[in-house]
Amino acid sequence: MKYSKRTLMFFFYFSQRFLKTMKNIISYNVNGIRAAISKGLLDWLRIVNPDIVCFQELKAQTEQIPVLDFEALGYHTFWFPAQKKGYSGVALLTKTQPDNVAFGMNIPKYDFEGRMIRADYGDISVISVYHPSGSSGDERQAFKMIWLEDFLSYVNELKKTRPNLIICGDYNICHKPIDIHDPIRNATSSGFLPEEREWLSRFIDSGFVDSFRHFNQEPHNYTWWSFRANARSKNLGWRIDYEMVSKPIEPLMRRALILPQAKHSDHCPVTLEMDF
């Protein structure tokens, strides 16, 4: 079948338009960005070439990060480190200049730890968030539970003006038994406690889609492994990194994957492809 020049031009225009609107969003807890860079993070980014990157757990101040190296890859970069050196911190890298960037939740005790950054693109917002871990003891577990409730309140308020959200990051919670290698032995472990899992269910029920589970219901898909006992080589992991998508923009999702072959951290990246 032969197509007219006009038809071919239309197909070309449409394909280019489609390619330009498809975005690949990667979320990655790097467990120290300087250490990840030393393990080849920049070369990996150059090859994978995502449109938006959400980093968590920078463990570095902005002046300690080779920002120009990321900019050389074509990114506008936005960094929100913790005030405490060598701890926490989030970032958002983007090929497209956002309309607006918001740093933190305007709650000092959380913003001090560099937990959240948001970029707005038209009527869609992308958030990089690092939920606290409670594994160090009761005090931090209590802090985590308070944070979770405050974060949900923040999101519910944000949705009144910015209803189309993509919330990427390390949630430090496995949602269901399928998301952890040993749900029985870990039933009393921080990250799989009933109250944490109940919160994540409420979060999703408030109007979000777990993008990975939308496309994949298979077990043994994890995003974090302990450094102990060769856990990663044995795939004894936890799925605690998510890219949550607001229900109104669920139809824009095209694919969501876990990328365990990337080994710059004790986590691996997760990726989401969307039309916007």
Features from the language model and the residues they span:
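N-terminal, active-site-proximal structural segment of metallo-dependent hydrolase catalytic domains
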Residues: 6-72, 76, 82-88, 103, ...
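Active-site beta-strand/loop signature of hydrolases that rely on acidic residues for catalysis
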Residues: 28-29, 45-63, 126, 155-177, ...
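Active-site-proximal beta-strand elements of phosphoester/diester hydrolases
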Residues: 23-31, 123-135, 168
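Structured beta-strand-rich core segments of catalytic domains in phosphoester-bond hydrolases
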Residues: 58-61, 66-134
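Conserved beta strand-loop-helix elements of the APE1-like EEP
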Residues: 85-101, 219, 230-251
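Active-site beta-strand termini and strand-to-loop segments that position acidic
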Residues: 95, 119-122, 246-247, 272-276
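Metal-dependent phosphoesterases centered on the DNase I-like endonuclease/exonuclease/phosphatase
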Residues: 52, 73-76, 149-236, 240
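Surface-exposed cleft-lining segments at the edges of enzyme active sites
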Residues: 106-107, 132-148, 184-188
